Amino acid sequence: MFPSLDTNGYDLFDPFIPHQTTMFPSFITHIQSPNSHHHYSSPSFPFSSDFLESFDESFLINQFLLQQQDVAANVVESPWKFCKKLELKKKNEKCVDGSTSQEVQWRRTVKKRDRHSKICTAQGPRDRRMRLSLQIARKFFDLQDMLGFDKASKTIEWLFSKSKTSIKQLKERVAASEGGGKDEHLQVDEKEKDETLKLRVSKRRTKTMESSFKTKESRERARKRARERTMAKMKMRLFETSETISDPHQETREIKITNGVQLLEKENKEQEWSNTNDVHMVEYQMDSVSIIEKFLGLTSDSSSSSIFGDSEECYTSLSSVRGMSTPREHNTTSIATVDEEKSPISSFSLYDYLCY
């Protein structure tokens, strides 16, 4: 960048750097020589004014800039940058030379690492992985898909849970083969216990089956009854709808019939009430007639008999008084005429009185 300066092998002195010890050789040799017995006081500034004036300003500026570049290059770098530089250098060497001898040695010295963890068993450490044959692998993965599991460990857990009894039997057999006669005796007892438990379980199952069968039968019967009821109701509804379709004025007819029946009942009630009123009026009139006869001094057996006698005689006397035609037989009319002949004055007077 800047032109180099020829100094004949001597370092130039920079006044801006205080710790620089480089000076001209004559001055240094004169101070450091052991033969010199004279002690000279170190001057505050070793160069004379004539020497400094001889240098140009451009020379000093160039020297100052060169020293700044050296200082910037000697700055301590971080280890991270230093490692990066080393890696770049190695890559460049590989690109140029290919595979170096150092790389080959490093490959030979590195050992193979087992990435998968192992399990300690009775026969030593074993790998967790296992290889399955093609047929068994297909069956296994088919079962896993049927169960809907994501991992193979879950399917194996399911298989273990379903084969607990067989695993127990295997353990017992292994223990019996290792133990001897005592274990065989224990096995027999355990077998007997298992058989008794099986019998109890079978009995319970039969009971539950019978009870469930009975409940099913009762439910079926109830359903049949309900069906029959619904069928009968449906038939009745169909019959009613058919009648209404065939005779649409049936409802009006029924209403008319009911109204007629009600009218007849009202008429019968009115007739009964009128009859009772007539009887009461007759009794009242008879009482009044007896009072009038007593007042006039006319006492006759016919009047007393007509008042306190039979109902037929009372009816005939009242009919004669009121002048009504009675639908009785001839004997009643004859009795009335006889009574009138016996007492013509009383009958005449009573009739006139009543008419009046």
From Swiss-Prot:
Deleted gene: phenotype: Increased shoot branching but reduced response to strigolactone (e.g. GR24). The triple mutant brc1 brc2 abcb19 is insensitive to GR24 treatment but is partially restored with regard to shoot branching.
Localization (cell): Nucleus
GO MF terms held by the record: DNA binding; DNA-binding transcription factor activity
Domain R residues, every copy: 216-233
Tissue expression from the record: Expressed in axillary buds, and, to a lower extent, in axillary structures such as flowers and siliques.
Pfam family, one: TCP
Gene Ontology CC annotations of this record: nucleus
Keywords: Developmental protein, DNA-binding, Nucleus, Transcription, Transcription regulation
Main location: nucleus
Induction trigger: Repressed transiently after shoot apical meristem (SAM) decapitation (release from apical dominance).
Domain TCP: 112-170
Spans annotated as Disordered: 173-226
PROSITE patterns linked: R (PS51370), TCP (PS51369)
Keyword Ribosomal protein: no
One Gene Ontology biological process: regulation of DNA-templated transcription
Compositional bias of kind Basic and acidic residues: 173-198
Biological role stated in the UniProt entry: Transcription factor that prevents axillary bud outgrowth. May also delay early axillary bud development. Probably involved in the auxin-induced control of apical dominance.
Name of the protein in its database record: Transcription factor TCP12
Species this protein is from: Arabidopsis thaliana
Lineage: Eukaryota, Viridiplantae, Streptophyta, Embryophyta, Tracheophyta
